[in-house]
Regions:
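Short, contiguous acidic/charged loop-to-helix segments that flank catalytic cores in large enzymes
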Residues: 433-440, 485-499, 525-529, 563-567
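Mobile, glycine-rich extracellular loop/lid and propeptide segments
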Residues: 2-287, 291-335, 339-348, 352-392, ...
Length: 598
């Protein structure tokens, strides 16, 4: 089995599970603990891209195991994973300066390579998408997105593949609508890259996801011709539908179908696909026939308008700005739960946030042998998608009388995933009833769940939401998920109330086939979206659960950085990588920590 990590979350199904690990067993981690082997320093403190790893690559006259890391300063590094030697670094251009125009919290110094690159091992190429200031000023309004192709051995651009400018890419949506043009000044490229049929797939959200110019884009670049081969826009008539997925990458089926999940935006089931899980098909160019990206299925739970009390099935819903929300009723559509009242928080204080409950906050992970995809967003509800026949939701399907039939298109009924509250019905005909904050905390899921087939429990999946604990589930041939247990530790225990607590758990798993599973998790102490906050690294036994006093299952911690007073800044949407006996941990203080058994 390969020990390479060539893409975000280990593989293109986005399972997050490295099943070729024989050193980092639960017994070894518990008995020996973990220590820092190497500290690798980068040129920008906020590392957003997941580290990648290639085993046994010849550089010079030496076979090496190499860690590749892209940074927000538009630099890509290659280090020897065993010695820490810097093998090369490559600068792709002047990054964009951090500002409140890009992120209201302004905790990023630079904006450059935000997404995780993808590596073509056979070709020896790393592909990265860089946000570059075209005039060198660093002003975001001069920024352009470029695709780079770097030699894995030297870090130099591949001959014949200079930086490819994506500006001006066009998409013709048909239906009598105008041709759309891609503009970098409006877009943010956070989702990890993928490769399908000889093309790099690049997904975009928007700098301001609730603006009228917000849209999701998918661009396919043919790596043989080094040209833009196809593009697709998620909201051609309306707006919104960003594809950001908290830095997760599009998930790729065995038949090369591309799965993405969109955030808040308009929905009509024809040209607008906000708040939807979408299957795309990429067809490469053939002779004089242009390449294409086309919708081949989707499923949608609700519209943003329905969340704010507008027409439940509406088409091209009004953008949900605070001023727009004033047009909607102020009481009936927002549940004022008692504990929220006790905190002095009025339901209306959530205002526009109820129209920003991104389904696409978590991305999607595929369990191909069951024919399903798992996804969850800011509501913390698990939706189990039938990836063979996702259902193709129409606006009329979202009317209360037909909601049950729309849920029936799923492979299993929705369930509460990142938390549990008996007062919340995840199979509701009226999505406005989801507008509440159980325990006065958000329970968003940011990033894909981790999936793994265990010799003990069968098919498992793990999640960890904002302000919540790590949770383990099992799922069988009936495709219904059953809760196994949770950790005692919670994310963001010191985040200020009310709400707060982004982003929850960043998790991955290492195992030796279906045995010796270890879940590796990074959680913040505070709210890692609004502020810089320290992080906490934990290792858990993935299968051998203990019992709490009430008899429920406990996921047992094997090792905890808190016990050793480790200090590192939490890397927001990033995740640890466990491979070849090492745990590679990116940080928000410019370090890549390489850990191993003590």
């Amino acid at each position: 089995m390969s020990t390479d990590v060539l893409t975000r979350s280990i593989d293109l199904a986005r399972t997050g599970a490295n099943t070729a690990e024989s050193v980092l067993t639960p017994a070894a981690v518990k008995a020996r603990g973990v220590k820092i082997l190497l500290t690798l320093q980068t040129d920008d403190p906020r590392i957003e891209a997941q580290p990648l790893y290639v085993a046994g690559i010849k550089i010079g006259e030496t076979m090496r195991n190499v860690i590749y890391q892209a940074t927000m300063a538009n630099t890509v590094y290659a280090w020897d994973a065993d010695t820490g030697d810097l093998l090369w670094k490559s600068s792709l251009g002047v990054p964009i300066n951090g500002s409140t125009a890009i992120d209201v919290h302004n905790i990023n110094v630079k904006w450059g390579i935000l997404s995780t690159p993808v590596i073509d091992r056979a070709a020896g190429i790393l592909y990265a998408c860089a946000w570059i200031s075209s005039d060198g000023s660093g002003n975001w309004q001069t920024g352009r997105h470029f695709l780079a192709a770097l030699d894995l051995v030297t870090g130099k651009p591949i001959p014949g593949k200079p930086l490819l400018n994506l500006e001006g890419t066009t998409y013709d949506p048909g239906h009598g609508l105008p041709v759309l043009q891609f503009r970098s000044v409006e877009r943010k490229q956070r989702a990890a890259l993928a490769m399908v049929k000889g093309a790099v797939i690049i997904c975009f959200g928007t700098i301001t996801e609730t603006s009228k110019t917000a849209r999701g884009w998918v661009i396919a670049v043919d790596v043989s011709t080094w040209a833009i081969a196809a593009a697709w826009c998620s909201t051609a008539r309306g707006s919104g539908g960003g594809i950001w997925m908290s830095a997760a990458g599009p998930a790729i089926q065995n038949d090369n179908s591309i799965w993405v999940v969109t955030g808040n935006g308009d929905f009509d089931g024809q040209t607008d696909f906000g708040e939807s899980a979408i299957r795309l098909r990429y067809t490469p160019a053939m002779g004089q026939v242009k390449g294409s990206l086309s919708v081949a299925g989707w499923w949608t739970p609700w519209t943003d308008g329905a969340r704010a009390g507008a027409d439940l099935k509406g088409e091209a819903a009004t953008r949900l700005t605070a001023s727009a929300l004033e047009k909607f009723p102020k009481v009936s559509n927002f549940r004022l739960v008692p504990h929220l009242a006790r905190m002095g928080v009025k339901a209306r204080d959530m205002g526009a946030a109820w129209g920003d409950q991104d389904l696409g906050a978590g991305g999607i992970v595929l369990i191909e042998h069951l024919g399903i995809g798992l996804l969850s967003g800011k509501d913390g509800i698990l939706y189990t998608i039938d990836i063979t026949n996702p259902g193709d939701t129409r606006p009329a399907d979202l009317a209360p009388a037909k909601a049950a039939m729309n849920y029936a298109k799923l492979a299993a009924q929705p369930i509460l995933y990142t938390y549990f509250d008996a007062s919340v019905d995840p199979v509701t005909p009226n999505p406005a009833t989801l507008n509440q904050l159980p325990a006065n905390r958000t329970h968003h899921l940011h990033g894909t769940p981790v999936t793994w087939f265990s010799a003990i429990h069968g098919q498992m999946h793990f999640c960890g939401g904002e302000n919540g604990n790590l949770r383990a589930w099992t799922i069988g041939p009936a495709k219904v998920s059953f809760y196994l247990g949770c950790s005692a530790e919670v994310a963001s225990p010191t985040a200020a109330v009310p709400a707060g607590g982004m982003p929850g758990w960043g998790i991955s798993l290492s195992a030796n086939g279906s045995n010796d599973g270890v879940v590796w998790g990074i959680i913040p102490y505070g709210d890692a979206n609004r502020t810089l906050t320290n992080g906490r690294l934990l290792a858990y036994d993935a299968t051998n659960l203990a019992r709490y006093a009430d008899g429920s299952g406990e996921i047992v911690a094997l090792w905890d950085s808190q016990d050793w007073n480790w200090n590192f800044l939490h890397p927001k949407f990033n995740r640890p990588v466990a491979v070849a006996g090492k745990i590679i941990v990116p940080t928000y203080d410019g370090r890549v920590m390489v850990l191993g058994l003590a």
